Amino acid sequence: MNNEKESALTAMNTNGRSKLTALLYKTLMSFVGVLVLSMGESFMLAANMGMDPFTSANLGGSSLLHMGLGNFQLMVNFVIFIFVLFSDRHMIGIGTVINMVLVGYEIQWFSAIRQSLFGTANSLTLQIINAVIGLIIFTYGASMYMTANVGVAPYDGVAPIISRWTHLRYRVVRVIQDIIVMGLAYLVGGPFGILTFIVAFCTGPLIEFWTDKVNQKIYNLI
């Protein structure tokens, strides 16, 4: 009888350690994904052909208030985080905090590094090269961060909540959300261009490609 109890306790402890280890690996995967997508954003910023709607709006707002992107985006994210927390706390996880806190600062950091290494993209060819590199890196990082499944970014949590409240399809709500934020980005003078539309409406297939071909396989090893 004692042996059975000891075996059960050992199994429970092992299972607990396994879950903790898996969570740590998923958290690391989310962290690396956010790091990579931020690097991609820095190349898109250098291309000067627009950014994703949310970052574009934050860049415009931070410029108007003479603040660094990291500080401004953290404040905006915190406000959205409170909304998501009280609306559907199940969407919140360690990945939410990682994305909320780090992305703005990492874009600043990688932009400085990219500028020191490669300089200004002062021709259309260099702009296109930076845009393509940025999109590839950004979508891979976004796929990795989402595949880790340890919480969504505050901005990404808004559409599912509104969709549930209004009974509209998620995709419809997300498109409306992005269009509204695109308009806001334009009004506050954020980087607005062809990349803004591409990231908002056309990157899904590339993110799915990275998920299916690479990141889901990494996740399955955890």
What are these regions (language model features)?
Residues 2-222:
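Core subunits and conserved enzymes of cellular information-processing
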